Amino acid sequence: MELRLYDTLTKEKRAFIPIDPSNVRMYVCGPTVYDFAHIGNARPVIVFDVLFRLLQHIYGTDHVTYVRNITDVDDKINDRAARDFPGLPLNEAIRKVTEKTAEQFQADVAALGCLPPTHQPRATEFVLPRDDGRADMVTLIKQLIARGHAYEAGGEVLFDVQSMPDYGALSGRRLEEQKAGARVAVDAHKRNPADFVLWKLSSENEPGWDSPWGRGRPGWHIECSAMSAAYLGDVFDIHGGGLDLIFPHHENEIAQSRCAHGTHTMANYWMHNGFLQVEGEKMSKSLGNFFTINELLTTEKFGGRKWPGEVLRLAMLKTHYRSPIDWTVDALEESKRILDSWYDIVGDDTEAIGEVDREVSAFLGDDLNTSAAVTRLHAIAASRIGKSGQLQIDAKRKLKVSAVMLGLLGRTKREYLETDPQVILVDSNLVAHLLSDRAAARARKDFKESDRIRDELAAMGVVLKDGKDADGKPETTWEIAR
């Protein structure tokens, strides 16, 4: 199948041609672990998980390397640690914050149905030169200084943006427009106001590593340059993240990596997902519409109920990844209704058997058009109506195997229901026993006993549906009352 991706750098949709089809390489910026991930953070996690699945489908499971980092050294982490654990030494407090937050992040993304990336490096593991020879931050900074792209000033090491003629190409911001940019700190010791920190000195209490420039810690941008190079090399296929990372983070990553390695590019395709707002407004703690993934999963703060992770995932995928998304209760309720109906169709089948629907594959290959793919899944679900026998079975299997490409319908109906805190589960063996008794009662025309068993099941929260199977024989199916 053909895969075309929109490249932020060239501002066009291009055919995807990997550097090495036997090892397709993708890097996506991960969390800074100072606070639980909010629902906006979930979008790139889900979007690039779908791309990871698609690349594995095209090139093979063992031929895709997906790296998503964890930033565990940052001034925001220091501030949170000092606030939350004022009685502890800062380094110990930082360890508590980062471990708890990283653990919660992993639980959140698992609940969203995301596959684990191939590698999840932590920034603190790549500050100093490593025994395995993988790229590290100190060595990259040395290379930048040696090549004339960085300098020491005011106790810091800074990147000289004027040393890179096409700095700003990704974001479209010309250097002369950035001299008084709102997001750029202007310091007297900088050669140019847009120069950014590669290394900063640490106080006695702050996290720090011994380096040629004194005890200090890395700047944010150099971390991703080191970790991507460590696992993917100097140039790789895809770099992803949210629109908010284009400038300054991704712009500065490109500058550091290209100048340190002497390459003309860092990644061949730059992909960015759109912004998320909540009920028509920008998400903000001050507006009271700021929600973490964990809050949506485990509390009733949004919409008066707890939401299964798969519902959150589908709600994200119904909008194209480059379009803005309005996160609403109505959208989640609709997504839940859709999943409920799809799981009613696939039931407790455990395997995704057969070929992925051609149209679903084509939509995903067209710049990851999950919105169109979801619409096509609706059509597949509807196509089983009026069919019987093998045709009905084929439609059901096509729905499941195609939805799995999006990370949906990857479990049995019962397993799905178990993820919904609002659903009361019952003993399926007991239900099967009672259904057998009811069938026997109906066969001997003991309708009073049949109705009694039906009422007993209803009291357990079980709804019966009497009908016929694919061969036209009487059949009773059941589901949990919703």
From Swiss-Prot:
GO CC term, one of those recorded: cytosol
Recorded name of the encoding gene: cysS
Family the UniProt entry places it in: Belongs to the class-I aminoacyl-tRNA synthetase family.
CDD domains recorded: CysRS_core
Keyword tags: Aminoacyl-tRNA synthetase, ATP-binding, Cytoplasm, Ligase, Metal-binding, Nucleotide-binding, Protein biosynthesis, Zinc
The keyword Plastid is assigned to this record: no
InterPro entries: Cys-tRNA-ligase, Cys-tRNA-synt_Ia_DALR, Cys-tRNA/MSH_ligase, CysS_C, Rossmann-like_a/b/a_fold, tRNA-synt_1_cat_dom, tRNAsynth_Ia_anticodon-bd
SMART domains reported in the protein's UniProt record: DALR_2
Binding residue positions for ATP: 285
GO molecular function list: ATP binding; cysteine-tRNA ligase activity; zinc ion binding
Cofactor dependence: Zn(2+)
Subunit and partners: Monomer.
Chain ranges for the short sequence motif 'KMSKS' region as given in the UniProt record: 282-286
Reaction it catalyzes: tRNA(Cys) + L-cysteine + ATP = L-cysteinyl-tRNA(Cys) + AMP + diphosphate
Pfam families xrefs: CysS_C, tRNA-synt_1e
Name the record gives this protein: Cysteine--tRNA ligase
E.C. no: 6.1.1.16
UniProt: Zn(2+) binding residues: 29, 224, 249, 253
Localization, UniProt: Cytoplasm
Motif 'HIGH' region, chain ranges: 31-41
Keyword Transport found: no
Cofactor note: Binds 1 zinc ion per subunit.
A Gene Ontology biological process term: cysteinyl-tRNA aminoacylation
Matches recorded under PANTHER family: CYSTEINE--TRNA LIGASE, CYTOPLASMIC, CYSTEINYL-TRNA SYNTHETASE
